[in-house]
């Protein structure tokens, strides 16, 4: 579970202003944080297949957002993946 404070920090870091939650890098950063949180959950609960479905949905949503960002603004895409450390 990602705290409200952590989400606010991500919005400030990746958004254009403090309330810019719709900006693609902000959405990707929040999804990445939720994915990392779920990874820790699955280390302790290997058989939780119900949550795995939601996890896979989040990963696929992030993948689609990254693809859209890559096609629309490649420089911002590179900055985002570097800041979040999600790809090589």
From Swiss-Prot:
Swiss-Prot/TrEMBL keywords: Ribonucleoprotein, Ribosomal protein, RNA-binding, rRNA-binding
Q: Which InterPro entries match?
A: Ribosomal_uS15, Ribosomal_uS15_bac-type, uS15_NS1_RNA-bd_sf
Q: What family is reported?
A: Belongs to the universal ribosomal protein uS15 family.
Q: How does it assemble?
A: Part of the 30S ribosomal subunit. Forms a bridge to the 50S subunit in the 70S ribosome, contacting the 23S rRNA.
Xref: NCBIfam families: S15_bact
Under the heading HAMAP family, the entry gives: Ribosomal_uS15_B (MF_01343_B)
Q: What is this protein called?
A: Small ribosomal subunit protein uS15
Specify the species. Answer: Metamycoplasma arthritidis (strain 158L3-1)
Gene name, Swiss-Prot/TrEMBL = rpsO
């Amino acid at each position: 579970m990602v705290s409200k404070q952590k989400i606010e920090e991500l919005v400030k870091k990746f958004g254009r202003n403090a309330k810019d939650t719709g900006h693609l890098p902000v959405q990707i950063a929040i999804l990445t944080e939720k994915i990392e949180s779920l990874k820790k959950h699955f280390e302790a609960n290997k058989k939780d297949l119900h949550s795995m479905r939601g996890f896979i949905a989040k990963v696929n949503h992030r993948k689609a957002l990254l693809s859209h960002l890559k096609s629309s603004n490649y420089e911002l895409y590179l900055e985002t993946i570097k800041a979040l450390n999600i790809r090589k």
